[in-house]
Amino acid sequence: MIIEGKIIKIAGPVIIADGMRGAQMYEMVRVGEQKLIGEIIELEGDTATIQVYEETAGIQPGEVVESTGGPLSVELGPGVMGSIFDGIQRPLELIREESGDFIARGVDAESISKEKKWTFKPVAKVGDKVKGGDVLGEVQETSAVLQKILVPPMIEGELTSIASEGEYTVLEDIAEVATDKGDEKIQMLQKWPVRKGRPYVDKLDPDVPLVTGQRAQDTFFSVAKGGAAAIPGPFGSGKTVTQQQLAKWADADIVIYIGCGERGNEMTEVLTEFPYLDDPKTGNPLMDRTVLIANTSNMPVAAREACVYTGITIAEYYRDQGYDVALMADSTSRWAEAMREISGRLEEMPGEEGYPAYLASRLAQFYERAGRVNTIGTTSDVASITVVGAVSPPGGDLSEPVTQNTLRICKVFWALDASLADKRHFPSIDWLQSYSLYVDSIEGWWAENVAADWRETRDQAMILLQKESELQEIVQLVGPDALPEADQATLETTRMLREDFLQQNAFDDIDTYCPPVKQYNMLKTILLFHKEALAAVGRGVPIQNIVALPVKEEIGKMKYIPQDEFAAKCEEIQAAITKQCSEA
């Protein structure tokens, strides 16, 4: 039943309508003569408070508000992958054809083409007992993604018919299931409410790392598949480039990139770069396994909340098909600011720094939809969603509410430091402030796939970096020459760790991605230099002789050695370290 109310008050993106008795919380509505998209966020008697996902200028009291009878939902099916959407899943390319470079108000574009035909290959057979999550057939959506057409959750019964191999639109019936409540026809298109998490059987321990090819993240502060990581940092510290690197190189099957309230130029960079980047694993365009959701800072604030939920719902859809998904949200602070603005318009009691009291629970709702799970269905797959959220604290203040509430939920914290960025140390991850609570759980994977002593090597390097900060305090008081020569050797090693290992050039063809085995061998080589340097100092060799060794230059160039030549070159460098330190 369609309910029609009338606008009685307008306050920016918040509208109050009368005559809405019978409407439901979070129901989607059409506002005014231009049919703007909105969502009911509060109900009291006959009046409904609506947040509008489009610009409300020009709307007048007395205009009609129509309910749609359902919550804000996304369309899921073939055609999602490789698309560029706005915050409420309208395809930006179609909108540009309709209304030009700026999104016209009330524009309605189909999220997924209803006319395009897809080649469907059936997998299930008539007579099979099926339930939610079972695979009915397959569609080659892009060169990189084989989409599995699943039985929607909540449907269970006997398959009475299934389409033969051929071309179908997403609205054509491809199967019919006889359930206890009658026959259910199934299409390739599914709709799902964005605020409701898709079901799974159970969550698993996150014990497999998400390999990103970035040395600082992989070796020292790993995130596990199904984990949640936060990247807080002030302006200009490299949050966006760090997230773009993860989107390009992380070993996830699917990447969802949400630009939530960020500068238009940054999203433009992503939109222009990604379609021309090749996926390192398949050689296909990276866009073939990426969904971009662009919601720039000049778009209506209410849509920021929607874009985060839209992104995580699309991620869950591909997770249900057995894929590992990486979701980048840049930045959750802008979403929190949108919540603060709408909360203020609703005249709610403010919490810390004006943010609403429910800030923590909203952040938790989002991050807790990450996880490594057993998917629903007769044959359960292991799949994951890894969430990486950027946080933009004003002035780089990590004690502000969004950062602190995010830290309570995320187990990985990559703190970006403006002073490191000013020194052109990128990625500017502060190794003293950052941490990962997944190191213990993923240690077994590294021992099995890279080296048995990976943890020991990593911890040894971390201890040296922490010791450097203690020694630097003394150096600033009395200068480096006053230190014992063994400590001077330690400072030389930590300089190499910082400059030759932690620094990584995102724009260099070779250094942009560093495989785990190469990371381990680079670290092992630097620590071998440390061991041999200490031994030489113990024999009475002056520290100046060790600092001047030619092999140091070779160690500095290790990051630029191509992968196929690295093993042989690494052995040469290690032999040269031992030889030159013994002859120094």
From Swiss-Prot:
Family of this protein: Belongs to the ATPase alpha/beta chains family.
Keywords, ordered alphabetically: ATP synthesis, ATP-binding, Cell membrane, Hydrogen ion transport, Ion transport, Membrane, Nucleotide-binding, Translocase, Transport
Bilayer topology: Peripheral membrane protein
Coiled-coil spans in chain: none
Cellular localization per UniProt: Cell membrane
Any single GO BP term: proton motive force-driven plasma membrane ATP synthesis
Top-level EC class as recorded in UniProt: translocase
Name under which the protein is recorded: A-type ATP synthase subunit A
Name of the gene this protein is made from: atpA
GO molecular-function terms, A-Z: ATP binding; proton-transporting ATP synthase activity, rotational mechanism; proton-transporting ATPase activity, rotational mechanism
Xref: Pfam families: ATP-synt_ab (PF00006), ATP-synt_ab_N (PF02874), ATP-synt_ab_Xtn (PF16886), ATP-synt_VA_C (PF22919)
GO cellular component labels: plasma membrane; proton-transporting two-sector ATPase complex, catalytic domain
E.C. number: 7.1.2.2
UniProt binding sites for ATP: 233-240
InterPro entries: ATP-synt_VA_C, ATP-synth_a_Xtn, ATP_synth_asu-like_sf, ATP_synth_asu_arc, ATPase_a/bsu_AS, ATPase_F1/V1/A1_a/bsu_N, ATPase_F1/V1/A1_a/bsu_N_sf, ATPase_F1/V1/A1_a/bsu_nucl-bd
Oligomeric form and interacting partners: Has multiple subunits with at least A(3), B(3), C, D, E, F, H, I and proteolipid K(x).
NCBIfam families on file: ATP_syn_A_arch, PRK04192.1
Species the sequence originates in: Methanobrevibacter smithii (strain ATCC 35061 / DSM 861 / OCM 144 / PS)
Purpose: Component of the A-type ATP synthase that produces ATP from ADP in the presence of a proton gradient across the membrane. The A chain is the catalytic subunit.
Catalytic reaction equation(s): ATP + H2O + 4 H(+)(in) = ADP + phosphate + 5 H(+)(out)
